[in-house]
Every structure is written in C-alpha cells, then in structure tokens.
C-alpha cells in the first residue's frame, strides 16, 4: 500500500513539472563596485521609505539656506550683538526647560594652552603636587600660569592632598571623611618645585584635614621652613583653614617663617551657614585672623569674600568692619562662579562697577590693600605684587606709606 501511494506522488510531480514553461537560468553579466562609474552600473530602484509625521514636518520646515539668509518670516530677526547680550537662556528638553543665567562677557577667559602652563603642570605632576588652581577650577589659571616671568607665572600649591574633610556648597574640591595619609615628602618636594621655578612670591593653601589631631598645622609649618631654607628670598603666603578653632595651631603656622597669613571668611555672616560647611563659622574665622596677628604682629593678615551669593550692602559693611576690628591688612572681592550643577547656584553676576565701589570702601576703612574684580581670587596676582613690594620695602626699612606710593604703578600694571 505504501509503495502504491509513493508511485502516485511521483506521477503527480512529473506531470506538474512537465506542464510548467521551461526557462533558461539567468546569468549575472555585470558587477557593481563602490567606485564603478554610474553609466556602467546596473540601475536599481530604491525601496521607498515609509513616510512619518516627523519626516513630513521636517521637509515642510525651513532649509539650511533659510537659516543662513534669515528669510524665515515666522521668527523675528535678532542682531548678533543682541543675541550675545541676552542674560538668560532656556536649556533642556521640551517640557522640562530651565532658565539659566548666561555668563556675562567680563567673566569669560581663554582656555589655557601656553608652553609655560604645560611646563608648570609637568613639574607639579612629576613631584606629585596639587594646586588649588586646578582643583577649584580657578578662571585665572590661563593668566597666572601662562606668563613667562615670575610675576605672571604664579601657582597656588595645595598641601595635604586633593581631598577635603569638609563639603562647602561652593567648592569643587573632592571630599571624604578619611582622606589619604599625608605625604611625608611633600614639604621637601614643594620647596624643590618653588626653588626650581624661581618665584618671588608663592601661595600655599591646603584642604581641611579634620581627621588629623593638629589639622595638618605641623605639616604646613614644616613646608614653610623647607621653602625658606631652599629659597630664602621667596615670600610665602599661607592660606589656611580654621583648625577647628584651635588657636595654638594658628599660632604655630603664623610663627613658621611665613610673610602673609590668609584665612578666608568667604561670605557675610548671615550667609555663612548656607555657603560653608557646618563646622566653619564666621566668628571662628574672625578669631583665627585675630590669633594670627597676635601671634606675629609683623605678619600681614588677609581675607577674601565672594560676591553674587545674595549678600546685601549692610551685610558686607558688617563683614568689613569685623575684619578691620581684628586688624586684617588685605581683603579681596571676587565673583562666585558655580563650578558644577551640583553646587550652589549663582544668585547674581555682580557688575564690575560694584567691585570698584567695594574696593574704594575697603580703602576708606583703612585696609592696606584691596584687590576687587569679577575674576579676582584670594591668591590673585595683583594683590601678590603689592604685598611682595611692600614686604621688600619693609625689609629695606622704608615706611608703609612710602612703599605704597612707590608700588602703586606696579600694582595697577599687574591688575591689568
């Protein structure tokens, strides 16, 4: 039975095949290559794509030529100068756009790429040193590191690592409860780098190290002594933390051989809890500056404030009065610039004329010097040029008043 069924299937297949028209197999006679001339290539009709609402809308919209020529009648024309003058801009995806404040033109700086910048960076990496210029994303880095002479090539060395135990809302330095151990070779390496550069003035600062019993004060003092040993003519400014209010540690650093003791109050008293870490208070910072002056009356004391955080004129007047009450010699004002979106937002970009106003006000109150401007930072080189000259005049036995007059031109030149 199975054999009969198989025979019937064979007969059906044979008869069906015989009834179909016989065709000769097609032979491919042409080949197409990526470089074949279009005249010799086999022509093929592309498969049409499925139309979508997005495609229709895109095709019906303005072309590139419309954007270039400005022939879009549906949108008002904006002069390029007006476009750059816009103070705010909407950014983000549709439905979630946020209004962001544009950076005003007086705060824009060039990207650092000079040979001197690369040389300083290479030296720092080779000696495993850190700078606040890089860690805090200072906008002046191209200016301070870009020059070829000692006045223009200024670096602020950050001691005790690149990780802080505190987390201020304005600062971009890394934070941790337990940073890495101190590098015992750092004081020697720092002194070696500074003597190699031949700078007349150097700024040392540090992260806060609340994990250490002395807050790193002895490490700081040892670095100053090493620098003075290798480069005795170099003037040293130390921008320190508050050492958790331990005034004995403040005195230790103040008597280490430095020339300028700096500690920043950062902002006015009313805004301090919001701007700074909870362990840093306005009154504690004032006490640090007072203790430094008492420990070493010959040392120049210095502090700095950021503007644009929402402070009022009355609050700034109060802050300046508190600084003068403890005989602070130098004060600087600079614009707060948000380092990342995770940090505190800028309340306002203060116009340069207000920085001029606060410079005049500080001088009226009796400060020895005030550097004030949107891009001024606590280690700004114009202030350093002034302090450097004043200290050298002091060493030569010239009075402060005479020194101020003689270096006024140099200060103005450095500020430019």
UniProtKB/Swiss-Prot annotation:
Disulfide bonds: none annotated. The keyword Ion transport does not apply. NCBIfam families: lipA, PRK05481.1, PRK12928.1. Its main location: mitochondrion. It catalyses: [[Fe-S] cluster scaffold protein carrying a second [4Fe-4S](2+) cluster] + N(6)-octanoyl-L-lysyl-[protein] + 2 oxidized [2Fe-2S]-[ferredoxin] + 2 S-adenosyl-L-methionine + 4 H(+) = [[Fe-S] cluster scaffold protein] + N(6)-[(R)-dihydrolipoyl]-L-lysyl-[protein] + 4 Fe(3+) + 2 hydrogen sulfide + 2 5'-deoxyadenosine + 2 L-methionine + 2 reduced [2Fe-2S]-[ferredoxin]. Residues 20-52 are annotated as: Disordered. CDD domains: Radical_SAM. Pathway: Protein modification; protein lipoylation via endogenous pathway; protein N(6)-(lipoyl)lysine from octanoyl-[acyl-carrier-protein]: step 2/2. Residues 147-368 form the Radical SAM core domain. Keywords: 4Fe-4S, Iron, Iron-sulfur, Metal-binding, Mitochondrion, S-adenosyl-L-methionine, Transferase, Transit peptide. Residues 1-33 form a transit peptide. HAMAP family: Lipoyl_synth (MF_00206). Coiled coil: none annotated. It comes from Aspergillus niger (strain ATCC MYA-4892 / CBS 513.88 / FGSC A1513). Residues 29-46 have a biased composition (Low complexity). The keyword 4Fe-4S applies. This is Lipoyl synthase, mitochondrial. It is found in: Mitochondrion. [4Fe-4S] cluster 2 binds at residues 164, 168, 171. GO terms for cellular component: mitochondrion. Its cofactor is [4Fe-4S] cluster. GO terms for molecular function: 4 iron, 4 sulfur cluster binding; lipoate synthase activity; metal ion binding. [4Fe-4S] cluster 1 binds at residues 133, 138, 144, 379. Belongs to the radical SAM superfamily. Lipoyl synthase family. Binds 2 [4Fe-4S] clusters per subunit. One cluster is coordinated with 3 cysteines and an exchangeable S-adenosyl-L-methionine. Gene3D superfamilies: Aldolase class I. It is an enzyme of class 2 (transferase).
